[in-house]
Amino acid sequence: MQNAKDSFYMALRSRLAAINPVRTILLRGTVRPGILVEEAEAPFGQLPNDVFVLRWLGLGVDLDLGSTMVAEQCEIVYQSCGTQSFGGLDRGRSLSEMDEELIAMAQPFYTPKLNYATTPPTTMLTKVFWDEPGFGSIAIQRDLLSRSAKLMVYSYQEQGE
């Protein structure tokens, strides 16, 4: 499933860079698109604002098909306290903008599966696909608005995975 998870993340990352090139994060001295995988980073004291954070939650396997299909639930968490220039009063607009970006990043609902353990990445035989994100309600914590969206990511296991 690691190849599917990596391919899903890289697809969202490249799509975000095209949709909103201004949404970035400085991470380990490098500016990159504002999306990251929580399990691949050092632990946070608090999640970064105005960044999409991917969390992998649960794994399922269907062995009754001709090929083994695996599925893992992905939660995408994001939050905003607005901008300083508006004193944070635009935090709702900022969160809505991130909602729209997430909807756009998720489409189309598939991407080629690549093996990122090799340089350059190797294209595999199958695709990674997912369903529409299901959005949770907005959580309010003082000046911070946050939301999470969940979706299932699917992939057929290939030989050697």
Model-based region annotation:
Residues 1-161:
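Charged, amphipathic alpha-helical segments and their flanking helix caps
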